[in-house]
Amino acid sequence: MSKVTSSTLLKYKQEGRKFTALTAYDASFASAFDGEGIDVLLVGDSLGMVLQGHDDTLPVTTAEIAYHTRCVRRGIERSLLIADMPFMSYATPEQAMENATALMQAGANMVKLEGGHWLLETVTKLTERGIPVCAHLGLTPQSVHVFGGFKVQGRDAENAQRILDEAKALEAAGAQLLVVECIPASLATAITQALTIPVIGIGAGATTDGQILVMHDVLGISSGYIPRFSKNYLKQTGEIRSAVRAYIEEVANGSFPSADHTFN
């Protein structure tokens, strides 16, 4: 079984083949997800909420992401492994280089950073030095206090255009993937069509090249608020591996996300 790389995902986009991603934080779940065919695994700073019990992702450290990245790496053979760069771990290009290096040495294939125009220099410098970058636009959880909560972004024309412009600029700067979160489906479509690189959506409609969800939502073990864009696949299948297969199948055939999981 050949390993998934950024080139694999680019080929999928060119062929119109949808791909799937999930968060993972340990070797056991990562192995199960990898074995069922999940293309991308993300060691997300979401672990601050779903594992550590925080109200947001801000307390997570680079050392914690590196620890979980090492755990996940030991459990996978095929999936592309992305590691989140936590809050304020990439405030300057120099800081980003140091922390991204630590995550790559922990086993990541790529690092993910939240932000737009202010990140362009950092993206270019990381890419030039051999560290692949996945950018993240829309609802960027590390900016939750700036947004005034976890809110859909890009609903008005001005902000939609800004997000589209930032997506193009990040691609030009060297980003190899882009995650768009909680934006209107029409904006996600425009971004996906405008970019050559693959676009992964979460709460962004069905037209993006790939979909990502938090594993706790897919397995119905999240506590408290359940995002509208998520779906509990364990409820309909009764078994973890079957739930993962159902998620993959529904993304592939276009039935997930449906209108119920999408913002306008």
Curated annotation (Swiss-Prot):
<comment type="similarity">
    <text>Belongs to the PanB family.</text>
</comment>
<feature type="binding site">
    <location>
        <position position="84"/>
    </location>
    <ligand>
        <name>Mg(2+)</name>
    </ligand>
</feature>
<feature type="active site" description="Proton acceptor">
    <location>
        <position position="181"/>
    </location>
</feature>
<feature type="binding site">
    <location>
        <position position="112"/>
    </location>
    <ligand>
        <name>3-methyl-2-oxobutanoate</name>
    </ligand>
</feature>
<comment type="subunit">
    <text>Homodecamer; pentamer of dimers.</text>
</comment>
<protein>
    <recommendedName>
        <fullName>3-methyl-2-oxobutanoate hydroxymethyltransferase</fullName>
        <ecNumber>2.1.2.11</ecNumber>
    </recommendedName>
</protein>
<feature type="binding site">
    <location>
        <begin position="45"/>
        <end position="46"/>
    </location>
    <ligand>
        <name>3-methyl-2-oxobutanoate</name>
    </ligand>
</feature>
<feature type="binding site">
    <location>
        <position position="84"/>
    </location>
    <ligand>
        <name>3-methyl-2-oxobutanoate</name>
    </ligand>
</feature>
<keyword id="KW-0566">Pantothenate biosynthesis</keyword>
<keyword id="KW-0479">Metal-binding</keyword>
<comment type="function">
    <text>Catalyzes the reversible reaction in which hydroxymethyl group from 5,10-methylenetetrahydrofolate is transferred onto alpha-ketoisovalerate to form ketopantoate.</text>
</comment>
<dbReference type="GO" id="GO:0015940">
    <property type="term" value="P:pantothenate biosynthetic process"/>
</dbReference>
<dbReference type="GO" id="GO:0000287">
    <property type="term" value="F:magnesium ion binding"/>
</dbReference>
<dbReference type="InterPro" id="IPR040442">
    <property type="entry name" value="Pyrv_kinase-like_dom_sf"/>
</dbReference>
<keyword id="KW-0963">Cytoplasm</keyword>
<comment type="pathway">
    <text>Cofactor biosynthesis; (R)-pantothenate biosynthesis; (R)-pantoate from 3-methyl-2-oxobutanoate: step 1/2.</text>
</comment>
<feature type="binding site">
    <location>
        <position position="114"/>
    </location>
    <ligand>
        <name>Mg(2+)</name>
    </ligand>
</feature>
<dbReference type="GO" id="GO:0005737">
    <property type="term" value="C:cytoplasm"/>
</dbReference>
<keyword id="KW-0460">Magnesium</keyword>
<dbReference type="Pfam" id="PF02548">
    <property type="entry name" value="Pantoate_transf"/>
</dbReference>
<feature type="binding site">
    <location>
        <position position="45"/>
    </location>
    <ligand>
        <name>Mg(2+)</name>
    </ligand>
</feature>
<dbReference type="GO" id="GO:0003864">
    <property type="term" value="F:3-methyl-2-oxobutanoate hydroxymethyltransferase activity"/>
</dbReference>
<dbReference type="InterPro" id="IPR015813">
    <property type="entry name" value="Pyrv/PenolPyrv_kinase-like_dom"/>
</dbReference>
<keyword id="KW-0808">Transferase</keyword>
<dbReference type="InterPro" id="IPR003700">
    <property type="entry name" value="Pantoate_hydroxy_MeTrfase"/>
</dbReference>
